[in-house]
A protein has these predicted regions:
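Mobile "lid/hinge" segments at catalytic clefts and subdomain interfaces of large enzymes
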Residues: 1-15, 205-281
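Extended amphipathic alpha-helical scaffolds
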Residues: 2-125, 281
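A generic local secondary-structure boundary/capping motif
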Residues: 85-88, 95-98, 119-124, 168-172, ...
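Glycine/serine-rich anion-binding loops at beta->alpha junctions
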Residues: 90-101, 186-200
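Glycine-rich, flexible beta-strand/loop modules in the N-terminal catalytic cores of phosphate-handling
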Residues: 95-178, 258-268, 272-277
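Alpha-helical support elements that line or immediately flank enzyme active sites
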Residues: 107-109, 197-209
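Acidic, glycine-rich active-site loops and adjacent beta-strand->loop/helix elements
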Residues: 111-115, 137-139, 184-190, 220-227, ...
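A short glycine/serine-rich beta->alpha loop
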Residues: 146-152, 184-192
Length: 281
């Protein structure tokens, strides 16, 4: 009960990522005091789970009943944006920086000749790839420590999603015969780094003089739904805790002419078509 007033007071005045971190720290201190004389690990585990249950309940209640969000934004309001082209282009062909709130991504562009295309080999086929987008998510991006090494499944998936979003606007080989490689690195994360990498990569391509057909941007749409599913709220530009405690992460990328890539992650049994249509309008 001690933690509820603190959460209710701070959820509307701070970044939700900071609030959840403070809540976890306070919760651990309270648990240490309560269970310092016992070795009942099962009871401690149940108590730890309660924090996440309450945070989940608090985020849903705020969106469904108060029509607002943890950092005070409206449900259809995006975070503050910042974009910059260049900066390190003296050692690379192009670069772009894109900030969306606490999510920061740096993309760099390198151009090569036709002989630099990536060779794709399968059991029964071989092909060449002229445009590549790679995504890196180092541990420090999320405020953690860890091994920095080969690419993991998450990085591969996010990189390929951004690559699919950008491929339709890449110029034809006959007009731009160069091999194009973009590397996006998340330097700070609070949700939607994959979509921020699409924006940063677009800036890097334009900074490097690649004649893309039109700029591409991406955003993540979240969902808060009640237990029965008859009441819901869509959230534009979800941040980390809203992704973690929310019911949907609907990644949508496209241009002024239409959608170029979609990825849907859900935590509920299913999402109604009407909800997806509303998210896309």
């Amino acid at each position: 009960e001690k933690i509820k007033p603190m959460l209710e007071e701070k959820l509307l005045t701070s970044e939700s990522k900071k609030v959840t971190s403070e809540a976890e720290t306070l919760w651990k201190e309270l648990l240490e005091q309560k269970y310092k004389d016992t070795d009942d690990e099962k009871e401690q585990s149940v108590a730890e789970d309660y924090l996440h249950h309450y945070l989940d309940e608090a985020f849903h209640k705020m969106a469904l009943e108060k029509n607002t969000r943890a950092d005070g934004r409206k449900i259809d309001e995006i975070r503050k944006l910042f974009a910059k082209a260049g900066g390190i282009s003296d050692v690379l062909h192009g670069s772009g920086i894109f900030y969306r709130g606490e999510t920061h991504v740096l993309s760099v562009l390198a151009l090569g000749g036709p002989e630099d295309m990536q060779t794709i080999e399968g059991m029964e086929f071989q092909s060449k790839k002229r445009f590549m987008h790679h995504y890196n998510f180092p541990p420090y991006s999320g405020g953690e420590t860890g091994r920095v090494g080969g690419i993991n499944r998450r990085e591969m998936g996010h990189g390929f999603l951004a690559e699919k979003a950008l491929t339709p606007v890449i110029p034809e080989k006959v007009s731009f015969p160069y091999t194009i490689r973009v590397v996006s690195e998340s330097t700070a994360s609070n949700g939607s780094t994959s979509q921020a990498s699409i924006c940063a990569a677009t800036i890097a391509l334009m900074d490097g003089g690649v004649p893309i057909k039109t700029p591409v941007a991406g955003i993540s749409i979240g969902l808060m739904e009640n237990a029965t599913g008859d009441k819901y709220v869509l959230l534009s530009d979800i941040q980390g805790p809203e992704d973690h405690y929310g019911d949907m992460d609907f990644k949508v990328a496209g241009t002024k002419n239409g959608i170029t890539a979609i990825q849907l992650d859900v935590k509920v049994a299913g999402v109604k078509i009407a909800i997806l249509k509303e998210a896309l309008t």
